[in-house]
Amino acid sequence: MRTTIRDIQQMRDRGERIPMVTAYDYTSAQIADRAGIPMILVGDSLGMVVLGHDSTVPVTLDEMIHHTRAVVRGARNALIIGDLPFLTYASPEQAVISAGRMLQEAGAQAVKLEGGVHIAPTIARLVHLGIPVMGHIGFTPQAVNQIGLRVQGRRANEARQLLEDALAVQEAGAFAIVLELVPAELAQAITERLRIPTIGIGAGAGCSGQVQVWHDLLGLYSDFVPRHARRYTDLATVIGEALTQYVHDVRTGTFPGPEHSSRMDPTELAAALGNLEES
C-alpha cells in the first residue's frame, strides 16, 4: 500500500525520522522501494547527475514527467514527489497546469516547489485544488545563478527571513518542507516551530527527516561531491571493475560461455543449411 501524506505527518508526530532519496528511473525506484524508503523525490537534480548539465536550470517539465513516470512504475509503496522545474510555476496559473501534468501524466502524488513567502500564494492555490505540495527553502538550486552555492541563513536577518518563509509555506498548506544548506541550529529552530515535517539536506540532524541524492549516496557521481553527502558505497568503482572484466571476457572469448547460449539439434541445423545451399 502506498505511503500517504497522512502517514508522513504521523511519522513526524511520533518523532520517527523520515528518510527520503531521489530516484530518476524504474530500477532505482524499485531498489529504494524495497529498502523501505517512504518518500522518493524525482528531483530536478537529474539535470546534473543524469543529463549532464551544470545546474538544474535547463531541466524541462517534459523531462521531469518522463522520469517521474518511470519512478512511479518502479515504486509501488513510496510516496512519489515530482519537482516542478525552473520557470514552470512563475504564476499560480502556470503552476496549476504544470502540477496538474505532473499528477495526471506522470502519476506523482505530490509536487515540490522552491521558494518562501513569495511562492506561498501559489502553494495555497495548488493545495486548494487538491494538489499536495512540498516546499523547499534555504539554498534553492533553481536560483543558483542569483544566490550562488552557499549556506543560507547564517546572519540574523537571513535567518529571520527563512523562518518567515517556512511559516508562510506551512500556512499555505504544504505538507512538508525541504531545508537545504541551512545552519543546523537554525534548521532545528525552524523544525521546532513548524507543525509539518522538515526534510533536511545539509541542514543538520535536527530536521524531521533527511534527503540525499541517489548518485551522491551510492558513489555514482564524481563531478561534484557535496560536503553534506555521505557515500554509503562506491558503486562507480564497482561498476567500472565489472565493465572492465566484461571487456576482457569478450575480447578473450570467455564470454559468452556454453551456459549463456542456446543449442540446436544438429540434424535441424544441417537441414536448414542444406536448404540454404540448394537455393
UniProtKB/Swiss-Prot annotation:
Keywords: Cytoplasm, Magnesium, Metal-binding, Pantothenate biosynthesis, Transferase
Signal peptide positions on this chain: none
Residues the record lists as binding 3-methyl-2-oxobutanoate: D44, S45, D83, K112
Enzyme Commission number(s) from the entry: 2.1.2.11
Pathway: Cofactor biosynthesis; (R)-pantothenate biosynthesis; (R)-pantoate from 3-methyl-2-oxobutanoate: step 1/2
Family membership: Belongs to the PanB family.
Subunit structure: Homodecamer; pentamer of dimers.
Protein name: 3-methyl-2-oxobutanoate hydroxymethyltransferase
